[in-house]
């Protein structure tokens, strides 16, 4: 039986593993399955499928289960590379209309063929030599633009987020585990302006509000839907189960496990 594989080949500059998408990312799932939550929607990829997670959005990949197979290739289209590409190829941008945070691209034989052509470039560690990063990223980007010219309006839009409705944005995105300065940037504000506007709306500091909202959701999920604490803490924006349990008890006077056990006895 084949051993479970959870492997990622990254082509491009290193990226910080966080729930803020700082650069455009092209995903190709070589084998297995992967899923994630980008913007306000769930997405899933199966073997041979691919898509683009767009920059300046919030998103997270669901952790692979113990026996799952997930082998994927990620191309990072960072801004310096895209600017150089645009200058070299004299790209004329078109208007890009989709607001989706994760773009499922239509099936086309060119993409799998390109991925297959990477085979000879892998070293013994299963990685592609950095000397070929730009060449291969350029080749893939040319294919994508040939298949969907309107993607030029996505890749070559170097603008920064504009000021938006902070209350609506936070009520929609508070479960994402990102630093407050990321929330400020995505709402088109400096950090000081964000904190000032936030307090004027919610009458609470961002950090306290975020923890309280996440814990209130946790209480409802455990009490009403009988969810297990270990199954929900990551989706609610907590990094560690121990921190989640400590914060939960401080707010509600009992641990999430105690609440779950009480609910189980009542069933």
List the model feature ranges, each with a label.
Residues 25-28, 110-117, 136, 143:
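Amphipathic, well-ordered alpha-helical segments in soluble domains
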Residues 168, 172, 177, 181-182, ...:
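Terminal helix-turn-helix DNA-binding modules in bacterial transcription factors
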Residues 1-96:
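N-terminal regulatory/effector-sensing and dimerization cores
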Residues 187-191, 239-240:
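Short coil turns linking two alpha-helices in DNA-binding domains
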Residues 1-7, 74-125, 193-195, 242:
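N-terminal/domain-start segments enriched in small and hydrophobic, helix-friendly residues
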